[in-house]
Amino acid sequence: MKTFLPCLFFLLILVGCAQRPTPPATKTADWAAHQQQLNDLTDWSLRGKIAIITPENRHSLNIYWQQSGDNFHITLTSFLGSTILDVKKTALSTRIIDDQGKIYFGKNTQTLMTRLSGIELPVEVLQQWIKGNPIGAVYQLNENNQLVSLTGQDNKNENWSANYQDYKTVQEISLPHQLKLTRQDLLIKFAIQKWLLEKTEIF
């Protein structure tokens, strides 16, 4: 009995150590490593669906987004496949083709998109936010070190909030597949069907 009690005490200590929660420092390191993956992810594309909802209107569209460094190409189409807006942004300028085939050029992508289509999309900050990278924002993580929500500003200093509902692993990187973006009475829902993580020649 005298031998049994010390052994039992030793086993209880081992069990307690095994069940000890992950130290905050380790979780911080895990998030830092994941965010570095997202920072390094500069060439990618996605396709999915987007719903833009206001008290007056609701638009349901397909979205195709190709990103190469700081340049991007976004195409919004109807469910029947007709182009609503085609946006190409480079370091020099933004070129937009509307649903009538007319071509426009400008410097501020977000402002030009809104003026031509009425669609308010914070594309400059969304380049990072859509990957789950909260650059320039206040954010919260879940127990898996995935972004749950963020609050930040676009390049017009307007406040936006984002909530992330679903993640899937794509080539060993955890990426969002559903998110909601809100600004006052504007709600934008993304349902991402596919991510492609490779360089594409789009410019």
UniProtKB/Swiss-Prot annotation:
Principal cellular location given in the protein's record: membrane
BP GO terms, sorted: lipoprotein localization to outer membrane; protein transport
Keyword Signal: yes
InterPro entries listed in its UniProt record: LolA/LolB/LppX, OM_lipoprot_LolB
Keyword Oxidoreductase part of the UniProt annotation: no
Topology of the protein relative to the lipid bilayer: Lipid-anchor
Alphabetical UniProt keywords: Cell outer membrane, Chaperone, Lipoprotein, Membrane, Palmitate, Protein transport, Signal, Transport
Endpoints of the signal sequence: 1-16
Lipidation (N-palmitoyl cysteine): 17
Compartments in which it is found: Cell outer membrane
Highest taxon of the lineage: Bacteria
Lipidation (S-diacylglycerol cysteine): 17
One Pfam family of this chain: LolB
Gene Ontology, cellular component aspect: cell outer membrane
Family classification: Belongs to the LolB family.
Subunit structure: Monomer.
Function: Plays a critical role in the incorporation of lipoproteins in the outer membrane after they are released by the LolA protein.
Record-linked HAMAP family: LolB
Name of this chain's protein: Outer-membrane lipoprotein LolB
Lineage, uppermost ranks: Bacteria, Pseudomonadati, Pseudomonadota, Gammaproteobacteria, Alteromonadales
